[in-house]
Amino acid sequence: MAQTHGSKQQAQRLEQGAESLRHGAQAQSRENNVSLSTVSHADEPSQRDESSRLTVRMENTYQLGPTKPFPVATVNHILEDVLTTYLQEAQYDPEFCRQMTKTISEVIKTQVKELVIPRYKLIVIVYIGQRDDQSIVIGSRCLWNPKSDTVSSYTFKNSTFFALANVYAVYFE
């Protein structure tokens, strides 16, 4: 219960930060609206530093498959809800989109973790790009077990940009 409360507080902090970013980005006007926005895991140091991580050794359960399947439909609903909530009224701004990719991916990860699906590793990737009569192809390749591993995906579009969110769920044996 305390963990759920903590993750809800984290989600609220992220939403407040996103709201301030949304208003700040809309207040700015840029002369050149065509630009490139990139985000990498190396852009900013992690909130957790390596020394604070505890090494946990778990005994082997000899369980080769999940006890219940990954709830793809529920995660798809989370993706749709989060992307629509955060981006419905937004306009494309490179700095705003850069921050929103981080915020949205953290919110999605927090909400999916609240489903408490045991023994699944989660990877959340969010892409946001400008819609300016161009084409883009986004692909991913994964080596996994199709019986237990899966992906959920949702695409959001408005008049100035598109957003794609993917959640990869890989069963940890």
Swiss-Prot record:
Q: Name one Pfam family in it.
A: Tctex-1
Region annotated Disordered, chain positions: 1-54
Q: Point to the regions of Polar residues compositional bias.
A: 1-13, 26-40
Source species, domain of life: Eukaryota
Q: What InterPro entries does its record include?
A: Tctex-1-like, Tctex-1-like_sf
Q: Where is the composition biased (Basic and acidic residues)?
A: 41-52
Q: Which Gene3D superfamilies match?
A: Tctex-1 (3.30.1140.40)
**What family name appears in the similarity comment?**
Belongs to the dynein light chain Tctex-type family.
Assembly mode: Interacts with ZMYND10.
Under PANTHER family, the record lists: DYNEIN LIGHT CHAIN TCTEX-TYPE 5, T-COMPLEX-ASSOCIATED-TESTIS-EXPRESSED 1/ DYNEIN LIGHT CHAIN
Q: What is this protein called?
A: Dynein light chain Tctex-type 5
